[in-house]
């Protein structure tokens, strides 16, 4: 990612994701105890965590993102420990957190299977994964458009896949569906309308 893109991305995220605040708040109401947030980013989730959360382990390799996110966390009064790493290789012990959170991150990781396996490793038995992500559109024509623009989209948006199909990755993982819904967010470009909001539990 270029320096310019890395510095602009926090503000792009804010503009795109703020309208989803109520949906994110509802999802994060299930967080508790020790939480790992994959891709803490600009800290948009910081003020949405309930009082049941003791601390947040913020996995965030981007210094410009962390500069914004850490300030928001401090303002929200959330205890946050930064981990400068990528989701495919988390420098955390097994069974070290109660809940993993991934909002608008799995679209950009290089190896979704490895990331989901790592999250399952670090989450304690009975723990949860809270997921909010844009996914492949069910309409074949739109899915084809998503795939066609993926190379250019990845360049413009830090490796993001506009229509990554998450089902094969989740089915191959150790996560079982607890609650799952697919919704369209129409304020976003049509190629990223379809989103999945879900809770999974370690199998």
Regions found by a protein language model. Give the residues of each.
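C-terminal alpha-helical "lid/dimerization" subdomain adjacent to the S-adenosyl-L-methionine
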Residues: 5-18, 132-192
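Conserved alpha-helix/loop element of class I SAM-dependent methyltransferases that forms part
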Residues: 14-34, 44-48
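Class I SAM-dependent methyltransferase SAM/SAH-binding core
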Residues: 36-38, 42-89
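A short acidic, Gly/Pro-enriched loop at the edge of an enzyme's catalytic core
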Residues: 88-99
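A short SAM/SAH-binding and catalytic strip from SAM-dependent methyltransferases
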Residues: 98-111
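A short glycine-rich, Lys/Arg-flanked "PGG" loop and its adjoining helix->strand segment in the class I
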Residues: 113-125
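C-terminal lobe and adjacent flexible extensions of AdoMet/dcAdoMet transferase-like proteins
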Residues: 195-203
């Amino acid at each position: 990612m270029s320096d310019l893109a890395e510095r602009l991305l926090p503000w792009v995220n804010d503009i795109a994701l703020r309208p989803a605040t109520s949906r994110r708040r509802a999802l994060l109401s299930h967080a508790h105890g020790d939480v790992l947030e994959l891709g803490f980013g600009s800290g948009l989730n910081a003020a949405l965590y309930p009082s049941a959360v003791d601390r947040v382990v913020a996995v965030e390799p981007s210094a410009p993102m962390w500069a914004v996110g850490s300030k928001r966390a401090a303002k929200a009064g959330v205890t946050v420990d930064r981990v400068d790493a990528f989701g495919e290789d988390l420098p955390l012990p097994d069974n070290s957190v109660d809940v993993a959170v991934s909002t608008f991150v799995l679209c950009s990781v290089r190896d979704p299977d490895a990331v989901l396996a790592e999250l399952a490793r670090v989450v304690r038995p009975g723990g949860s994964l809270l997921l909010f992500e844009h996914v492949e559109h069910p309409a074949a024509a739109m899915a084809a458009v998503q795939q066609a623009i993926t190379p250019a989209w990845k360049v413009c948006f830090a490796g993001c896949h506009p229509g990554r199909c998450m089902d094969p990755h989740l089915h191959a993982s150790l996560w079982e569906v607890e609650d799952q819904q697919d919704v369209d967010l129409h304020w976003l470009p049509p190629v990223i309308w379809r989103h999945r909001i879900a809770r999974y539990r370690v199998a």
